[in-house]
Amino acid sequence: MDEEESTERQMQIAMLCQKLAMMKQLFNEDDTDYINQAISSNSPDTCRTFLSNLEKKGNPQADPSLLSKLMDSYTRVFSSMPLGKYSQNESYAKMLVRFAELKAIQDVNDAQTSFDIARSHCKDFAFVHVAYAQFELLQGNMKKCTMILQKAFEMNAKPRHVLEAAVRNLKTGKRQLLSHEDKENLSVSALDHTQGSRRSDGTCELKPSNTFLHSDQKFSPQEENGPVWRTGSQHRRTAMAERVPMVPLSIPENETSDSDCAQKAEAPFTHSSGFSRQTSGSSVRSAFSLCSSKKGTPDGDSYSLNIKPPVISPDYLREDIEEGHTITALLNRAEKRETARTEETTDINQIISTNSTEGCQAFLKNLEKRADPHSDAAFLSKLLDCYSKVFARFPLAEHCKTESYARMLVRYAELKGIEDPEDAADDFSIARSHCKAFAFVHIAHAQFELSRGNSRKSVSILQKALSSNARPIELLQTAIRNLKSGKTLLLPAEHQESSEAENVEAQNGMKREENPVKAPEDHQKPFSKETSSEWKIPALITKHTSPEDRKAPVEPVSSSSSHHAVRTPAPLRLNPSLSCQTPNYRQPNPNSFVTPVVKQRPVIVSVPATAQKMCPTALPCTPQSGVSYIQPPTQTPSSAFSNESITIKGKQFFIFKMIGRGGSSKVYQVFDHKKHVYAVKYVNLEEADAQAVESYKNEIEHLNHLQQYSDQIIKLYDYEITSSYIYMLMECGHLDLNTWLRNRKTVKPLDRKAYWRNMLEAVHTIHKHGIVHSDLKPANFLIVDGSLKLIDFGIANQIQPDVTSIMKDSQVGTLNYMPPEAIKDTSSNGKPGSKISAKGDVWSLGCILYCMTYGKTPFQNITNQISKIHAIIDPSHEIDFPDIPEKDLLDVLKKCLVRNPRERISIAELLDHPYLQLQPQPAPEPAETSSSDFKRILNELVALQSPNSIARAASNLAMMCNSGRKLDVSECVKSSSQTLWK
């Protein structure tokens, strides 16, 4: 026993040594101090230099730890340098591009989202468009690659010769849009720009060089090491308290009480760094010229910029800069911003607390008049957040019959269309299915589809609205007439005004009654030129306001003004003092001004994840959206409640993230009020054909019927079917078998055997109930708590118990797992067809087991599809079965992959196969023990004084008895004697 304890102590010592070694390695490799220094410099140039040097330490494609460290570092940089402030800085744009390229190593879809964000916000840089086009070209999307480059010319991205070179290379069929020489020239140009315009000493004086003054140069650099003069509270406010969860405009200047918000892109920079002596307008466009005279600041060391933006006059911008000449003025300004923000949050909460959907609609409508959501990304995100708060307070099932609620649903969908038309289509479908009694809901959806070029669907929506008896019918008839006449606007503005005038008057009356003191101020507040009806017309989704329209709401307003003058609350989806967000997670329309939005999905440390609209507290998100099937252990729903929810039969579920999509369906990870996690499959029946709708309904029927028969079928807890959508509330797993196999080079024998049994049991269950799957593949199985479960029925077909096979009018299945009989032509009477049966599922399962054994499918090495089909059905083509130690496994593989289905083994036989049976060891014959042996053992036990020693000796004796071995008295005595020396 001494040896055992000694061995245990040695193991503990070894573990401690290992931990110390890991800590030492971590200490040596820890770049925290360096990244902190780079971030504290407030210089994208410095941060990019640090990240470039960090990447040179290895190969991110081959080193996951380096890739993770790089992603974390980019995350921290983007958290501290919001996109809205630095998007016009060249180094920042290059960091966005490189981040997207690194994301492509992890997830192509996330990389595409990151490229979209970079292109929509840094559209003046040609290299951003070229990098995105290169990414799409490598994915094989030639058409999208061409479109991106064409859009870059339309956006007047510079330098133009880079775009021209990329187009030339694309037309000549080259895989690289920019040659190595072109990239070097681009890098040298950027380096000259950075070095020539950087301050030469620590006096914060800017030395403009010839390079900086050159007309082709777009931006002055960001300062690196300006002395920072700010209090601790101001540090905290800048770093954390004003971090906006959905929009990375996290610094005070974009949260001011001024209504110009994001339109004043340069002046806020002075405010954000108001306690540091630095040059103003560090990211000014090339259209701005540098003045030689200096501003009359107390220090006299900062240059003013003669800014001539198209929206805000230079005088207005300079006046705003001059307000911050003294620290006292800046402190007062910061305090006003903080007070205004508190009042804004309180104001929206007060409106919601009135339990009036009419009041909420009036507030949101008036709020929207303060800026243009089409061109102001920050304002758009705040509007969406306000709508989300309203919907969270007023459940859809209870208020869908209210006109004001229906109008809010419609306007929310229209605003979502600016960010993501796909999400907007879903929101329109939800609004139309729940508020079908209102004609304007159907017309808005039809207008949205018409604006996307789907005139056929627009007609279908209006026809269904007529059949559903939506009111007023006159509006529908007008919309149909306008559609048939070829007009792009289904309803003129006067129709919108007349249909809503009565409702608006009632809302205004309610507001005057609730806010009698503020009513005069509402009257005085100047609004934009947008008419009261204009906001409801879906066709205006892609409208960009003119500079004249945008000037109207620029006038600063007091923080104590009415609802019209109240700033939109920061979209605090979580704890407002802790949330840190960065450019993130959308799949935006390339033609829209896209807010870098986190789709409310929880972030996994070092590998940030693609939800759906959920962001965790105190963890910065990165500009990407990785769809992670693994739930982070530290993330709890209680700390991350989402404002986006799904209601299924009156029960509300909050969206974590989207974990999958395909065709007309999407799968979300959700949780309820009790923090139970589920998966919700949403199917948009508007986009599905009749056959797809029928297959979805069959899937629900099968799942619902088979719940009681097997634990290897995914659990279906509830579902809701309407004419326009389907909700399926199901069990949520960790990851599918296909992903699990992709992440492993080899599979452990015990895991393979356990998963094989799970698959057989699941398929055996559906076969017993007359269901043939006919498209089994690893992606059809989900790992839930260490067990495999069948998650769908593919192209499942129910057959009668006395029928062995059925005929299909086309070949079905996935080729690498498709049985020969499903490929062979069994046409009759000139009608093509193929045969499927339960034995076909056995072949598919055999291919999965083959993949788990050899790391590939039987015919995976044949790349030509025609040759692969011939090999599958050709009996003379022998399937390779390399020798393996498990002979029973080899026998299973050979019997599953028999081309003749009649000779192929059945599921029932596979369950009884020796491969799945435990191989019991022959039990040893019990040996007789003499009475003298017992006597010696008992005497030895009596001689022991220590209770621990007696217990150990008795334990050894029991182990000998249970093992069936003959009792070794000397061994027992030896063990007992050893304990006496302890």
UniProtKB/Swiss-Prot annotation:
Needed cofactors: Mg(2+)
Ranges where the Protein kinase domain occurs: 653-916
Effects seen without this gene: Mutants show anomalies in the chromosome number of male germ cells, leading to aneuploidy and severe developmental defects in their progeny.
EC top class, as a word: transferase
Residues annotated as signal peptide: none
Chain sites annotated for binding ATP: I659, G660, R661, G662, G663, S664, S665, K666, V667, K681
Regulation: induction: Strongly induced in a subpopulation of cells in the proximal blastema during regenerative outgrowth.
Keywords: ATP-binding, Cell cycle, Cell division, Kinase, Magnesium, Metal-binding, Nucleotide-binding, Serine/threonine-protein kinase, Transferase, Tyrosine-protein kinase
Role summary: Involved in mitotic spindle assembly checkpoint signaling, a process that delays anaphase until chromosomes are bioriented on the spindle, and in the repair of incorrect mitotic kinetochore-spindle microtubule attachments. Required to prevent chromosome segregation errors during meiosis. Required for fin and heart regeneration.
Family: Belongs to the protein kinase superfamily. Ser/Thr protein kinase family.
Protein name (record): Dual specificity protein kinase Ttk
Source species: Danio rerio
Taxon lineage: Eukaryota, Metazoa, Chordata, Craniata, Vertebrata
